[in-house]
Design a protein with these regions (language model features):
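Mature, structured domains of secreted/extracytosolic soluble proteins
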Residues: 14-178
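Sec-dependent bacterial lipoprotein signal peptides
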Residues: 1-12
């Protein structure tokens, strides 16, 4: 009888120990996932008050997985809130209509998947870069300033000090390219 009681006690101890290890592993995994998310472009996009307008549009148009889970590397050329304020209200209203898909295409026009990230935009100079939506963009330099240029010749000034995240870099634009 005491042997049986000892055996039951041993089994219960092992089961509880196994549960604690499993809970600890889940907690460690959750912490790792949370840390990875904090270093993702999605976190940077949502946390940065300079690009709240773009952030809202990106989340509403299903770009969360790209910015949160894709390993990249990705360049996001993010029009600032001020850039969106320059767009006339009729155009902005048509972009907000998710049924026409215009905002999804517009955001895709500002995203480029690259082979490598660099602290220096000069490695991308005068190369045809293909945006996520299939359009062709170029980074050009005039004096000390860099610009993003589309095939129509529209340009946006690329601001200094990009936000560098694990899966890509967020550069700030003074214009929306459309």
């Amino acid at each position: 009888m005491s042997f049986l009681l000892g055996f039951v006690f041993l089994m219960l101890s092992c089961a509880q120990s196994g549960q604690r290890v499993e809970q600890s592993e889940q907690t460690d995994q959750n912490k790792a996932e949370q840390e990875k998310m904090r270093r993702s472009m999605l976190f940077g996009l949502i946390a940065d008050s300079r690009i709240e307008t773009l952030s809202a549009f990106a989340v509403a148009n299903d770009y969360s997985d790209l910015f949160g889970k894709d390993s990249g590397p990705i360049l996001l050329f993010a029009p600032t809130n001020e850039a969106f304020e320059k767009v006339d209200s009729v155009t902005l209203r048509s972009w907000r209509d998710q049924k026409n898909g215009m905002m999804k295409r517009l955001i895709g026009n500002h995203i480029i998947k690259v082979d490598q990230l660099s602290d220096d935009l000069s490695i991308y100079l005068d190369k045809n870069l293909t945006a996520l939506n299939g359009s062709t963009l170029k980074i050009i330099q005039e004096q000390q300033a860099y610009y993003l240029e589309d095939v129509k010749g529209n340009r946006a000034l690329i601001g200094p000090n990009p936000l560098r995240m694990d899966n890509g870099d967020i550069y700030y634009l003074d214009e929306v390219l459309y």
